[in-house]
Curated annotation (Swiss-Prot):
Protein source organism: Acetivibrio thermocellus (strain ATCC 27405 / DSM 1237 / JCM 9322 / NBRC 103400 / NCIMB 10682 / NRRL B-4536 / VPI 7372)
GO CC field: cytoplasm
Function, in words: Catalyzes the rearrangement of 1-deoxy-D-xylulose 5-phosphate (DXP) to produce the thiazole phosphate moiety of thiamine. Sulfur is provided by the thiocarboxylate moiety of the carrier protein ThiS. In vitro, sulfur can be provided by H(2)S.
GO molecular function terms listed in the Swiss-Prot or TrEMBL record: thiazole synthase activity
Catalytic site: K97
Pathway: Cofactor biosynthesis; thiamine diphosphate biosynthesis
Protein name according to UniProt: Thiazole synthase
Subcellular localization(s) per the UniProt record: Cytoplasm
GO annotation, biological process: thiamine diphosphate biosynthetic process
Protein family (similarity comment): Belongs to the ThiG family.
Entry EC number(s): 2.8.1.10
Main enzyme class: transferase
HAMAP family per record: ThiG
Amino acid sequence: MDDKLIIGGREIISRLFIGTGKFPANRIIPDVVRMSGAQVVTVALRRIDFDSDEENMLRYIPKDCILMPNTSGARNAEEAVRIARLARASGCGNFIKIEVISDNRYLLPDNLETIKATEILVKEGFIVLPYMNPDLMDARRLKDAGAAAVMPLGAPIGTNKGLKTREMIKILIDEIDIPVIVDAGIGKPSDACEAMELGADAVLVNTAIATAGDPVVMAEAFANAVIAGRKAYLSGLGPVKEYAEASSPLTGFLR
């Protein structure tokens, strides 16, 4: 089965992307990455201390992973662009996850500023994956701006509430012909499986793994869930019906 995910010219086999925040200790991150099978790992640039090898988050991310810095902390397009440029200048490559958040309570993304940042960074050669509220018109604008994918939230960051925006995400999947990667709010493996069954191209998970009792085992559970959900989607889910329908004939065999 030819089922490749291509982003920015890179073939990505694992459809589970992972974040690196909130872990009880950075030293477990390599094991988490290994058990998850993830190829794409995101990290906030503000958590990278380039002057300290011990505290430098990059030390714990396997070298064969695609590093995707994010612009966490940016409150507007200007700040997001500045962080992205700093990440590339620091050797973190061209992949960038745009996060523009000016709302301190719910941490919801500012789609307008995100679109502005995407337009600028795409012109500068970045491979831009913007985190967004799942709005169809804004997703189209991000695509037109050159985004390599869109990353709609399932629920507010860090809440583990699952796919509260399920119907809106499904609209993006149906209408946008660039990858749709569900990001934020995924709280358990079944949430990730559900997103993949909907037809999402990938999911990004951080809090649900990092705050689990055993993050390494949870990473493996998420990996299995993503694979199962993708296979279910590709296989074609059976129709949902209003009334019961017997799987075997109910008449004729007692004559």
